[in-house]
Amino acid sequence: YDRCTVGVVTGIDPEATVPEFDIVGAEQMYSVLRTQVDVVLPDGAAVLDASDPLVAKMASLCDGDVVFYDTGAGSQVVDAHLATGRRAVLVRGGRIVLATGERGVPVAELSRLEIGSNGEPRLDDLLAAIATSWALGIGADLIRTGIETLCTVRSESNETVVA
């Protein structure tokens, strides 16, 4: 394909190589994976893992918007991005939040989700999927329903409810 609406890069494994094509290090893998960001349309978005410095560096290559995601709190990359009024999916106060600038809309309580066990998605993978959905224009209510459908949800009484 020539261009795309949403391009996603979830990480660069520094050990990943493709020696038969002379890709023998992280910087060379960066050059390969950056093409996914290079082809994002001006009205599209790149979804990037803010916790991976090489992936975060790709933001400047995008013709469209950038939606960062990060499992940690206080990421300088995310904080600077939000300070410009842009979007990020992050964990804040035990919640998964869709943040735009200083505003945030919670879409899930982490304490109510089974994450990273028994075949459930890992948190970083879940955040990437949420960020991709949001980049495609899907609203918070539908994203919330998707999370509850994908993950096992604990009720208020801590009983496991399979959604």
Name every feature range the model reports, one short phrase each.
Residues T10-I12, D49-S51, M58, Y69-G72, ...:
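Fold-independent oxyanion-binding glycine-rich loops
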